[in-house]
């Protein structure tokens, strides 16, 4: 019986971690792309601010897509700007997920959005 209870708790635990907030309760402001260096040493900075407009503290996962001039996705990466820390209502955190990307000369456009929300 104890095993059944423990098993049920482990299965249901991830469900309890999702916040009552939705991805639309978060906004990304001042998103900027900057490349520094040259040749093989080019480093990307893909930075911005993640703002919590939800009524409760929560964290959000951000997805960035790097696209060529035709709109084809070359690379896509996801990250949690605040890590495992919840962002208080009305507060923001700065992020830079550029280190997750390997620079390609045909990267022309970038899209960014919130894809998941949870409480830690």
Please place each PLM-identified region on the residue numbering.
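Intrinsically disordered, low-complexity Pro/Gly/Ser/Thr-rich segments with frequent PxxP/GP/PP motifs
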Residues: 75-104
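Terminal connector regions
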Residues: 99-120
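Short, acidic/polar linear motifs in exposed loop/turn regions
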Residues: 52-56, 70
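Short, well-ordered beta-strand segments enriched in hydrophobic/aromatic residues
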Residues: 44-50
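Positively charged n-region of N-terminal signal peptides that target proteins for export
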Residues: 1-4
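Hydrophobic h-region of N-terminal signal peptides that target proteins for export
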Residues: 9-19
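Transition segment at domain starts
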Residues: 17-43
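Short beta-strand and strand-turn-strand segments in soluble, beta-rich domains
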Residues: 26-27, 59, 71-81
